[in-house]
UniProtKB/Swiss-Prot annotation:
Pfam families, sorted: Fer2 (PF00111), Fer2_2 (PF01799)
Role according to the record: Iron-sulfur subunit of the xanthine dehydrogenase complex.
Protein name (Swiss-Prot/TrEMBL): Putative xanthine dehydrogenase iron-sulfur-binding subunit XdhC
Pathway involvement of the protein, from the record: Purine metabolism; hypoxanthine degradation; urate from hypoxanthine: step 1/2
Residues involved in [2Fe-2S] cluster binding: 44, 49, 52
Cofactor(s) required for function per UniProt: [2Fe-2S] cluster
InterPro entries: 2Fe-2S-bd (IPR002888), 2Fe-2S-bd_dom_sf (IPR036884), 2Fe-2S_ferredoxin-like_sf (IPR036010), 2Fe-2S_ferredoxin-type (IPR001041), Beta-grasp_dom_sf (IPR012675), Diverse_Oxidoreductases (IPR051452)
Annotated organism of origin: Escherichia coli (strain K12)
The keyword Iron-sulfur appears for this protein: yes
Superkingdom as given in the UniProt entry: Bacteria
Record CDD domains: fer2
UniProt keywords, alphabetically: 2Fe-2S, Iron, Iron-sulfur, Metal-binding, Purine metabolism, Purine salvage
Length: 159
């Protein structure tokens, strides 16, 4: 394969249709950042930190491990797509109000993971164990996670 080859990817990003071009091995995180979506952080680049978490068809994924080519025909949501009409989403508001995070590097990934977790249909409220499991792929070096878990609990109570 010629390394200068590109593929065309048609997808929806934050509700807008896109036709993008990328090399076949390009990670989705890189492609999204090239579109100016800087909430998609490039942390570890090996799926360990969760800073690059986005939603693909409603499922939280590590976009550093997800090839851009796989986004063909998919609905992608980043933190930038969560606010509507200049108003923060319910989850964004909860994180801002609680002060659950400190430096902010992990915040976009945590918000997207929380959004996906809360969107899943359930018969019972999430338990603390389920929340911790749901956020396990998102590292935060500044906190002990309890305020983050409490924020998710608050989000669920008020949704």
């Amino acid at each position: 394969m010629n390394h200068s080859e590109t593929i065309t990817i048609e997808c929806t990003i934050n509700g807008m249709p896109f036709q993008l071009h990328a090399a076949p091995g390009t990670p989705l995180s890189e492609l999204l950042r090239e579109q100016g979506l800087l909430s998609v952080k490039q942390g570890c680049c090996v799926g360990e930190c969760g800073a690059c978490t986005v939603l693909v068809d409603g499922t939280a994924i590590d976009s550093c491990l997800y090839l851009a080519a796989w986004a063909e025909g998919k609905e992608i949501r980043t933190l930038e797509g969560e606010a509507k009409g200049g108003k923060l989403s319910h989850v964004q508001q909860a994180y801002a109000k609680s002060g659950a995070v400190q430096c902010g590097f992990c915040t976009p990934g945590l918000i997207m993971a929380t959004t996906a977790m809360l969107a899943k249909p359930r018969e019972k409220p999430l338990t603390i164990t389920e929340i911790r499991r749901g956020l396990a792929g998102n590292l935060c070096r500044c906190t002990g996670y309890q305020m983050i878990v409490n924020t998710v609990l608050d989000c669920e109570k008020t949704k």
